[in-house]
């Protein structure tokens, strides 16, 4: 098996949504769940899916979990979530993002040294507000700590057939471009300085929330954004 970039444990709605978004951006994934029905369903969409008990330290150790770029824990059961996160920490995985059921669960995970504990319902609310402010046509996700993940079409004709090195998004907008989806749905990743912007491109980027208006106005100068 090719080394996956991310491991997702727990294939409920949250875990599968994260997996689908990462897949669309050309990341390699390993998906894990204890429920064989969920893994059977997931295996129809993803290449690497394992049915195993992630609360079992030995099972995780065999997967060399510390070599993954990050692990997303989407388990709903609080006790199982805590056990899995404890195992991940013991095995040396530091980049852990975990779903929390409530504020108490979130605090427990934070005290364990989990990098990010998220309550999905609150995140959804924040994302909707940001989209209402900046335009519902943009796919915007608040990653926490004022960091925004955004996917948006490029309508600035001045950028068409120009190289990323010439446009210099980072210097002009404080945004980092992650990937580009062409009009034929082909995803360009990773990107290089000579990668060109073409008509119909949809760009995925990460930026600070305070720089979002600057970025959107740069790629779509006719867009009227509030604030």
Swiss-Prot record:
RCK N-terminal domain boundaries: 3-119
A Gene Ontology biological process term: potassium ion transport
Molecular function terms from GO: monoatomic cation transmembrane transporter activity
InterPro entries per the UniProt record, alphabetical: NAD(P)-bd_dom_sf, RCK_C, RCK_C_sf, RCK_N, Trk_Ktr_HKT_K-transport
Pfam families in alphabetical order: TrkA_C, TrkA_N
Ranges for domain RCK C-terminal: 134-221
PANTHER family hit by this protein: KTR SYSTEM POTASSIUM UPTAKE PROTEIN C, POTASSIUM CHANNEL PROTEIN 2-RELATED-RELATED
Protein name, as recorded: Uncharacterized protein MG323
Organism: Mycoplasma genitalium (strain ATCC 33530 / DSM 19775 / NCTC 10195 / G37)
Lineage: Bacteria, Bacillati, Mycoplasmatota, Mycoplasmoidales, Mycoplasmoidaceae
């Amino acid at each position: 098996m090719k080394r996956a970039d991310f491991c997702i444990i727990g294939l409920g709605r949250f875990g599968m949504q994260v997996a689908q978004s990462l897949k669309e951006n050309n990341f390699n994934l390993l998906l894990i769940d204890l429920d064989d029905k969920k893994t059977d369903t997931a295996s129809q969409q993803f290449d690497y899916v394992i049915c195993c008990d992630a609360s079992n330290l030995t099972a995780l150790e065999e997967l060399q979990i510390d070599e993954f770029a990050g692990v997303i824990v989407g388990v709903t059961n609080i006790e199982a979530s805590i056990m899995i996160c404890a195992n991940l920490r013991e095995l040396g995985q530091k980049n852990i993002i975990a779903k929390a059921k409530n504020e108490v669960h979130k605090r427990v995970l934070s005290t364990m040294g989990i990098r990010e504990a998220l309550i999905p319902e609150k995140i959804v609310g924040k994302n909707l507000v940001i989209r209402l402010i900046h335009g519902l046509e943009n796919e915007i996700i608040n990653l926490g700590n004022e960091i925004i993940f955004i996917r948006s079409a490029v309508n600035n004709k001045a950028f068409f057939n120009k190289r990323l090195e010439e446009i210099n998004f980072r210097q002009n907008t404080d945004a980092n471009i992650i990937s580009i989806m062409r009009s034929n749905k082909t995803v360009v990743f990773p990107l290089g300085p000579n990668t060109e912007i073409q008509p119909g491109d949809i760009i995925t980027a990460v930026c600070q929330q305070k720089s979002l208006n600057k970025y959107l106005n740069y790629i779509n100068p006719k867009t009227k954004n509030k604030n």
